Amino acid sequence: MPDNNSDPAVSMASRALGNPWAGFILALVVIVLDQYTKMWASNELVYRVPVEITSWFDLMLAHNTGAAFSFLASAGGWQRWFLAAVAMLVSVFVAVWLTRLEQQQRILGVSLGLILGGGLGNLIDRVTLGYVVDFISWHYQNWYWPAFNIADSAIFCGAILLLWDSFSSERGESA
C-alpha cells in the first residue's frame, strides 16, 4: 500500500521522533535550557524578591533543598545526597527504558526524554549547589504555588505524556 504522507519533512520528523535516541536529544535540550535559565535567574534576580510579570505570575529566585513542593527541605542536610541518589537511580532506569523503546513508541520516547532531562537538570543543581534553583512563581491573590523551574516543568509534562501514553496504549491506540 502506498504511503499517503507525501510530505518528506513530516515523514522525516515522524521517523526522528520514533527514534529512541530522540529522547536523549530532548533530554539534552531540556538540561541546557534548564541550566541556562537557572544561571540567568541566579545572576539577575534577588533572592526571595519577586519581580511581577503579571498579576498572577512572578519571577522570584528561590533555593529548594528538598524535593517537589519543598518536601524534606528542613530535614537537616542528609536529604541532599539521598535525593541525589534517588534522582540518579531514576535517571538510569529512564535511560535504560529509552534504549528499549520500539520505533512506534513516539509519545513514550518524548515523555521519557522530558523526565530524564528534568531529573538530570535538577540533579546537577543538587550535587553542585546543595539545592535546586527555582524562579517561576504563580499565584492568585494570596495563594502561591511553590516556585519551580524548567526542569520541574519538563518532568510534569513528561509525566502527563506518560499517563496519556499508558491510557491510549491500553485502548489499543498507536501513539
Which residues does each predicted region cover?
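Alpha-helical transmembrane bundles and membrane-interface segments of multipass inner-membrane proteins
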Residues: 1-175
